[in-house]
Amino acid sequence: MMRFLILATNNQGKLQELRRLLAGTGWVVQAAPPDFAVEETGTTFAENARLKALAAAERTGEWSVGDDSGLAVDALGGAPGVYSARYGRNDGERISRLLAALAGQADRGARFICAIALAEPGRVLKEVEAECRGVILHAPRGNGGFGYDPIFLVPELDKTFAELDIVEKERHSHRGRAVRKLLSGCSRGTFIVDH
């Protein structure tokens, strides 16, 4: 019997990463319907991940994974935070706005945060959160990734997320870490649920 797992996102970058990270788990991983949208009304990444997972599960009748993630910059009090995707109209505008906000700032510490919720219709089964610390550069570097990847430097690698190959990024990223937490204790095609 095939077991379907719906990814509650239409963000193509997240979708591709989640598909790669969940490959080989025994689940048939599918995107949410093309018109799927959830208003992100949560005040935390975890709340938004939960909203997305529950909405996708209700809509499709299948187990669903909701991901909410973003960048929290120390000198900006954690901004853009849950508003990371809405910090501008596109990646270039978001990066420009963030770099302008950090002009003259010595403290450029930041962290990418990823919250993931697994839900079936009517209830959340498991929730995890992970992060990756780094530094915001003064200018973009690298051609890979998406979002804020070109300005997020991982100090121990001396590379931005945009300079990492897929395997390296998945090993070090907030999303890779969160998916590994989600899958911990799982066997093929099953999840160990919290509730």
Swiss-Prot record:
Its cofactor is Mg(2+). One of its GO terms (molecular function) is ribonucleoside triphosphate phosphatase activity. It catalyses: XTP + H2O = XMP + diphosphate + H(+); dITP + H2O = dIMP + diphosphate + H(+); ITP + H2O = IMP + diphosphate + H(+). GO terms for biological process: nucleoside triphosphate catabolic process; nucleotide metabolic process; purine nucleoside triphosphate catabolic process. Keywords: Hydrolase, Magnesium, Metal-binding, Nucleotide metabolism, Nucleotide-binding. Substrate binds at residues 9-14, 69, 146-149, 169, 174-175. Homodimer. Pfam families: Ham1p_like. It is an enzyme of class 3 (hydrolase). It comes from the Bacteria. Pyrophosphatase that catalyzes the hydrolysis of nucleoside triphosphates to their monophosphate derivatives, with a high preference for the non-canonical purine nucleotides XTP (xanthosine triphosphate), dITP (deoxyinosine triphosphate) and ITP. Seems to function as a house-cleaning enzyme that removes non-canonical purine nucleotides from the nucleotide pool, thus preventing their incorporation into DNA/RNA and avoiding chromosomal lesions. Mg(2+) binds at residues 39, 68. The keyword Transferase does not apply. Belongs to the HAM1 NTPase family. This is dITP/XTP pyrophosphatase. One of its GO terms (cellular component) is cytosol. Binds 1 Mg(2+) ion per subunit. Its EC number is 3.6.1.66.
